[in-house]
UniProtKB/Swiss-Prot annotation:
Protein function: Catalyzes the oxidation of glucose 6-phosphate to 6-phosphogluconolactone.
One GO MF term: NADP binding
A GO cellular-component term linked to this record: cytosol
Transmembrane region(s): none
Domain of life (superkingdom): Bacteria
Name of the featured protein: Glucose-6-phosphate 1-dehydrogenase
Catalytic activity annotation: D-glucose 6-phosphate + NADP(+) = 6-phospho-D-glucono-1,5-lactone + NADPH + H(+)
Native source organism of the sequence: Escherichia coli (strain K12)
SUPFAM superfamilies assigned: Glyceraldehyde-3-phosphate dehydrogenase-like, C-terminal domain (SSF55347), NAD(P)-binding Rossmann-fold domains (SSF51735)
Pathway in which this enzyme or protein is active: Carbohydrate degradation; pentose phosphate pathway; D-ribulose 5-phosphate from D-glucose 6-phosphate (oxidative stage): step 1/3
Post-translational modification: Probably processed by the ClpPX protease to generate the extracellular death factor (EDF). It is thought that processing produces Asn-Asn-Trp-Asp-Asn which is amidated to generate Asn-Asn-Trp-Asn-Asn.
Underlying gene: zwf
InterPro entries: G6P_DH, G6P_DH_AS, G6P_DH_C, G6P_DH_NAD-bd, NAD(P)-bd_dom_sf
Length: 491
């Protein structure tokens, strides 16, 4: 079936219909797509779960989720349209025969079936088997899966093999929700539509790059999941490496899904290996202790409800990443991410090299670097720090740091920036895979991450403590300071 830019008529089947992901993210995003007129008039939304619900009961659950997790008041006209799309199928995913009930509800002739797995990856194999046995897996049916998939290369391959037994790669949409953020999408335009950056985006002009994804919250009651994953698997493998790829990739031949993803895979294959020989030099792992966050006292990681008091799981990671290719040789990428940090923010800062000759020593003995800051959240936008002459009659060139600032909300008069899930759901309905992660991307990322986590395990060093509400262990500052650089300060 040909791909179009219009959302096709779909049966969107949400496995895990009463779970957190569905209630917090998917349902509010579907409401916003309805509001924007982006849903095909014939699209239906079918919740799947073990609950003994009918259409009316599920409709009530959806309404409650929207009232709880949306910041705006529900428009009753929109609600009437959205609620008319809803239905529910009572189904245990481990009961393969029960999938025939789902099949009876679907309209495979006139609608594309999109199976959204809003459930743990351990269930994906059973779901795919049920769909396959019920003959619900033929093209153009699609499956949507949340990253991270597995906790290592081996477990990721196992999950992908289970899915691949019933669905071809062109049917599989692996979500990394950071790829749906407007500011991440803008990286392609910023880099490849502007000659200012197209011609100045390599080791000739760039000194280093910093990528920070900071969270104010702790583990939010997710001890069971997080303690097995840790910040490395949960955030570095899952989100920060994708951002790094978008910053470091070479220009694709076009904007097709495979052209973009081919270039990202090249970056991942060029990442210099970190193993036991250099892991202490290149990485810092930390774990938050009791402190103050969001204006209140909070417990340390080992004091959280359900905690294993001897856990060595990291809640903070800082890494120096080197890319061994012609474009980036000699340009370090510094990544850091953690929980219980002072603020919630995600940003990329690109530092440009200073001029070879300083003509303004009377004003600045050492010229500061120009830097491009890409604010992914909050206050989405881009700013460039430059030096300008201070106006005046003084014969000296008094220079001052100023910023050229593009704020998305102000520049584009946007009161509502589409949530990442709105974009990704819509792209799934359109059949466009450019914002989704291909299997080889996932596996190359896991290869690189596995060598680090294996080195940590062999060293058996405890993560370095940092107080909740601070910017991580002192060692993370020392790591970048050794290179004569410093982390960007948040305003």
């Amino acid at each position: 079936m040909a791909v179009t830019q219009t959302a096709q008529a779909c049966d969107l089947v949400i496995f895990g219909a009463k779970g957190d992901l569905a209630r917090r993210k998917l349902l509010p995003s579907l409401y916003q797509l309805e509001k924007a007129g982006q849903l095909n008039p014939d699209t239906r939304i079918i919740g799947v779960g073990r609950a003994d619900w009918d259409k009316a009961a599920y409709t009530k659950v959806v309404r409650e989720a929207l009232e709880t997790f949306m910041k705006e008041t529900i428009d009753e006209g929109l609600w009437d349209t959205l609620s008319a799309r809803l239905d529910f199928c009572n189904l245990d995913v481990n009961d393969t025969a029960a999938f025939s009930r789902l099949g009876a509800m679907l309209d495979q002739k006139n609608r594309i079936t999109i199976n959204y797995f809003a459930m743990p990856p351990s269930t994906f194999g059973a779901i795919c088997k049920g769909l396959g046995e019920a003959k619900l897996n033929a093209k153009p049916a699609r499956v949507v899966m949340e990253k991270p998939l597995g906790t290592s290369l081996a477990t990721s391959q196992e999950i992908n093999d289970q899915v691949g037994e019933y669905f071809e790669e062109c049917q599989v949409y692996r979500i990394d929700h950071y790829l749906g953020k407007e500011t991440v999408l803008n990286l392609l335009a910023l880099r490849f539509a502007n000659s200012l950056f197209v011609n100045n985006w390599d080791n000739r002009t760039i000194d280093h790059v910093e990528i920070t994804v900071a969270e104010e919250v702790g583990i939010e009651g997710r001890w069971g999941y997080f303690d097995k994953a840790g910040q490395m698997r949960d955030m570095i493998q899952n989100h920060l490496l994708q951002i790094l790829c978008m910053i470091a990739m070479s220009p694709p031949s076009d904007l097709s899904a495979d052209s973009i993803r081919d270039e990202k895979v090249k970056v991942l294959k060029s990442l210099r290996r970190i193993d036991r020989s250099n892991v202490r030099e290149k990485t810092v792992r930390g774990q938050y202790t009791a402190g103050f966050a969001q204006g209140k006292k909070v417990p340390g990681y080992l004091e959280e409800e359900g905690a294993n008091k001897s856990s060595n799981t990291e809640t903070f990671v800082a890494i120096r990443v080197d890319i061994d290719n012609w474009r980036w040789a000699g340009v370090p990428f510094y990544l850091r991410t953690g929980k219980r940090l002072p603020t919630k923010c995600s940003e990329v800062v690109v530092y440009f090299k200073t001029p070879e000759l300083n003509l303004f020593k009377e004003s600045w003995q050492d010229l500061p670097q120009n830097k491009l800051t890409i604010r992914l959240q909050p206050d989405e936008g881009v700013d460039i720090q430059v030096l300008n002459k201070v106006p005046g009659l003084d014969h000296k060139h008094n220079l001052q740091i100023t910023k050229l600032d593009l704020s998305y909300s102000e520049t584009f008069n946007q009161t509502h920036l589409a949530d990442a899930y709105e974009r990704l759901l819509l792209e799934t309905m359109r059949g466009i895979q450019a914002l989704f992660v291909r299997r080889d991307e996932v596996e190359e990322a896991w290869k690189w991450v596995d060598s680090i986590t294996e080195a940590w395990a062999m060293d058996n060093d405890a993560p370095k403590p940092y107080q909740a509400g601070t910017w991580g262990p002192v060692a993370s500052v020392a790591m970048i300071t050794r290179d004569g650089r410093s982390w960007n300060e948040f305003e």
